[in-house]
Amino acid sequence: MKEYILNSKDAIRKQNTNSITKGWLLKWKLNDTWLKAPGFLYNYMYESYTEIIASVVAHSLGIDRCIQYKPCILVIDGIRVLGCESKDYKGDNKEITFSKLANIGEINDYRHSGYTGYKELIKEFKQKYSINLQSYLEDVILLDSIILNTDRNMWNLSVLVNKRNKVIECPIYDNGTSLGLDGLHSGMFEEKYMYDNGFRAEPFDIYFENQAKYIRNDILYLVDTPEIERAISYFEVNFCKNNKYNVVNTLQKGQIQFVKTLIASRLNTIVRNRLCIIT
């Protein structure tokens, strides 16, 4: 695993200054690689784990348009943490969020608009920008429904604009508030934190199962469950049972079990809805 020596003063900070963003990440950019430290420095220490596991789940589903986050060790001002790294997806392109487009009057605001709004959003992008986002949004909705991403919103759904002013797809990113880990602090694993008791979806409907029904019936996902199991086992061995890398943001046994149970339960729910096949 790669290790980086960093100074917090050199970080590009994204602070939780309003209700739009729940995350608090310290970020550094080295050439075409982004390094991200979890928000544990302030309030949420598990964001690296959720980003990495979420990207593994996406890969296991064959969702290639999701950013792949890999584990790395970040030594920040002498403090060792598990962080994550990813490749820069923008390059020379300009990123514009759906919320930004709505705020400047380019598109309508489709938050909490249900299936009708979902279809209208796809139609509007087709008419105005000659891009079909249906498959992209289906991947987002499926991934979010499995990892229980409670922070998907119009601020982390984006498109890219290239040098020729053509609108193209933006990869799926920002899955850090997922897997229930943002609600699990100080060893609290009570039933109230379980996946079916209090989690709310975004951005079209408050229920993940309702959004999952937006996916076309003829779309089939094959799930590589061993890939997910290997990733969770890696964290269990090296960051729970043992602190192999001597980091401060380790996981507890209850959290590992919680994530295992949650993903298995969510996959079974999706299978019952005949949206994918587990292998």
Predicted feature locations:
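Short alpha-helical "patches" and their helix-cap loops
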Residues: Q68-D77, N153-K163, C276-T279
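ATP-dependent phospho-/nucleotidyl transfer catalytic cores
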Residues: K87-I141, K163, N249-K253, T269
